[in-house]
Amino acid sequence: MALVRWGLRRQNFHLLRRRRVLLLKLTVVVISVLLFCEYFIYYLVLFRCHWPEVKMPARGGRQEPVLKAMFLADTHLLGEIRGHWLDKLRREWQMERAFQTALWLLQPEVVFILGDVFDEGKWSSAQAWADDLHRFQRMFRHGSHVQLKVVIGNHDIGFHYQMSKYRINRFEKVFGSERLFSLKGVNFVMVNSVAMEGDGCTICSEAEAELREISRKLNCSQEQVQGSSQCDHEPRLPLSAPVLLQHYPLYRASDANCSGEDAAPPEERSVPFEEKYDVLSREASQKLLWWLRPRLILSGHTHSACEVLHPGGAPEVSVPSFSWRNRNNPSFIMGSLTSRDYALSKCYLPCEDTVLTTYCAAAAFLLVLILAHFERLPSSFLFGWKLCRSHLRR
């Protein structure tokens, strides 16, 4: 009798031990997959990104300083109306990890977000705006050595007939109202492209007047109005054609000439763009090119990549969305800029499909592990499983 009891206790001990081993295996697999998909994958993918090299002619016997800038667009932080909590959690964690990893690995000096920071800024209440802003500041936190500049987008203040002084002031109170500034000898102009409707509305007229004043300052710095009294007391900007940053792209008929893995899907590229909705109007685009004479234009809004050469030789780069919510393969632009030259490269983030496939593969592996433990696999699979285990133990 004592021998039988001893045998039962030993059997129970082995069963308990096997269950503990199974639980340990399951825990290790789950934690490993979570760490890889939610943390380490960002380092593995972004580690391949490098700053482009810009030509460095000596200027006065010394090298020109190079500004390292990141350009991203259309983060679309969800609000209280259209934002499901799981959607918020998933997509905001993706953007936070991508941004923080990029800051740590790439060490940019300035980051530009080209509009549509928020998805519901066009109708959010004061409390909803404060909540969305708090989440944004947590996700895109940065050290004092990095500057963050944000361009106004239509989802931040509304389309032309939705925007108001209140929404614009609310946005500028947080992100600043500066339109023209210089960093390391590079001039930047940030445009409220939503206000480029051209219908003479108060906000539109003020925006155009501000751009004409910026044009005058740039002309004074480039000594194109020599001897003019209006330039006598004007502080000179660096002698450099500006980089134009805005949310809406300049006018183009469609994305038909755009290419690349992050361009719009082939079936959408030939769909004509609507002026003042998908892109700026022809007239507004011509005004910006004439007033500012930019050497480079960067825009967002379309959520897809495109490169366009405008009349006069001004190149425009449309930056894809930074969020999985808008595309499977988000990316951002890395720019090395001097006062006379620039070089751009693209840095891709992890694809959402890759992460989901990894989770599905891990779930299938866990299922096989559990079925093998309880010997519920078909005989052929069970034989193969035992064969693999015996081979690994050698």
Swiss-Prot record:
Signal peptide interval: none
UniProt cofactor(s): Mn(2+)
Topological type in the membrane: Multi-pass membrane protein
UniProt: a divalent metal cation 1 binding residues: D116, N154, H247, H301
Cofactor note: Binds 2 manganese ions per subunit.
Main location as per UniProt: endoplasmic reticulum
Binding site for a divalent metal cation 2: D74, D116, H247, H303
Any single GO BP term: GPI anchor biosynthetic process
GO molecular function term, any single one: GPI-mannose ethanolamine phosphate phosphodiesterase activity
Alphabetic keyword roster: ER-Golgi transport, GPI-anchor biosynthesis, Hydrolase, Manganese, Membrane, Metal-binding, Transmembrane, Transmembrane helix, Transport
Transmembrane segments: 27-47, 354-374
Any one annotated GO CC term: Golgi apparatus
UniProt EC number: 3.1.-.-
PANTHER family, alphabetized: METALLO PHOSPHOESTERASE RELATED, METALLOPHOSPHOESTERASE 1
Function: Metallophosphoesterase that catalyzes the removal of a side-chain ethanolamine-phosphate (EtNP) from the second mannose of the GPI-anchor protein intermediate. Participates in the glycan remodeling steps of GPI-anchor maturation to allow an efficient transport of GPI-anchor proteins from the endoplasmic reticulum to the Golgi.
Subunit structure: Interacts with GPI-anchor proteins (via the GPI portion). Interacts with TMED10.
Protein name: Metallophosphoesterase 1
